[in-house]
Amino acid sequence: MIIVTGGAGMIGSNIVKALNEIGINDILVVDNLKNGRKFKNLVDLDITDYMDRDDFLTQIMAGDNFGPIEAVFHEGACSATTEWDGKYMMLNNYEYSKELLHYCLEREIPFLYASSAATYGETTVFKEEREYEGALNVYGYSKQQFDNYVRRLWQDAEEHGETLSQITGFRYFNVYGPREQHKGSMASVAFHLNNQILAGENPKLFAGSEQFKRDFIYVGDVCKVNLWFMQNGVSGIFNCGTGNAESFEEVAKAVIKHHGKGEIETIPFPEHLKGAYQEFTQADLTKLRAAGCDVEFKNVAEGVAEYMAIVNG
């Protein structure tokens, strides 16, 4: 069996779909369906079982046996970069992750987890090294702290001549694609621009967006990276982006091209995001490629075109 936490979320449900596509359906999805709309992400997927996050954590902390587990994809987290309740964020993204990690280490279960490019903050260098990290929000800090916890475990193991079972963290950059409709304001720019055009409006970008460049990665490519590491058993913390930064304007142009209408409008940059907003991200893929991962990534034009074809079917 494979366990996917956050399995009803955007990345989690796409990982389940990718597993289904290679013939794997013995999957336990763990999530919190308080936001009931997320169920739609599971409707067309083939899974063995579903478990509420709190019930799952209770069983994990009790050391319960789930039977043979081939791997755990830990995608479950509070991913709202605008959430400032640090106690809530650290409990969800740090403490719970440690519990699950140790459960997996004790049983030598491969543990593949979601980190984030939010760990980098304002740097212009995006290498998986401590000197370039400095989160701008509490979400990024929770991910940064868990990465550092994992690093300490590796260091301790090395000092004692031990080898840990697989732990692989993925620093997701700006992920977009199908199954994000439940995310509200946290959904991708492509999602919001598409909805604006469908509503008969022009697509709207923040003033200065031509200067803001991000590494936008299509969710299908994120899944390919996850599956490659599951199949190859490589440990480490790796960037999961395309290696190229493109502007928000490029995203808007790709959405406009799909619809054949619309002109970009600018709106004022929100006060609450000033000082807590990454204006530039671009994954350094040196470490990913050195590990042997040869997944090729779609650019914005290609990825958004595929996304629009799916959601506007």
Curated annotation (Swiss-Prot):
UniProt keyword Thylakoid present: no
The protein's role, per its UniProt record: Catalyzes the interconversion between ADP-D-glycero-beta-D-manno-heptose and ADP-L-glycero-beta-D-manno-heptose via an epimerization at carbon 6 of the heptose.
Key words of the record: Carbohydrate metabolism, Isomerase, NADP
Highest taxon listed in the record's lineage: Bacteria
InterPro entries: Epimerase_deHydtase (IPR001509), Heptose_epim (IPR011912), NAD(P)-bd_dom_sf (IPR036291)
This enzyme's EC code(s): 5.1.3.20
Active site: Y139, K183
Biological process annotations from GO: ADP-L-glycero-beta-D-manno-heptose biosynthetic process; lipopolysaccharide core region biosynthetic process
Subunit structure: Homopentamer.
Reactions accelerated catalytically: ADP-D-glycero-beta-D-manno-heptose = ADP-L-glycero-beta-D-manno-heptose
Record's protein name: ADP-L-glycero-D-manno-heptose-6-epimerase
Domain notes: Contains a large N-terminal NADP-binding domain, and a smaller C-terminal substrate-binding domain.
Manner of cofactor binding, per the entry note: Binds 1 NADP(+) per subunit.
UniProt similarity note: Belongs to the NAD(P)-dependent epimerase/dehydratase family. HldD subfamily.
Residues given in the record as substrate binding sites: N174, S185, H192, F206, A207, G208, S209, R214, Y277
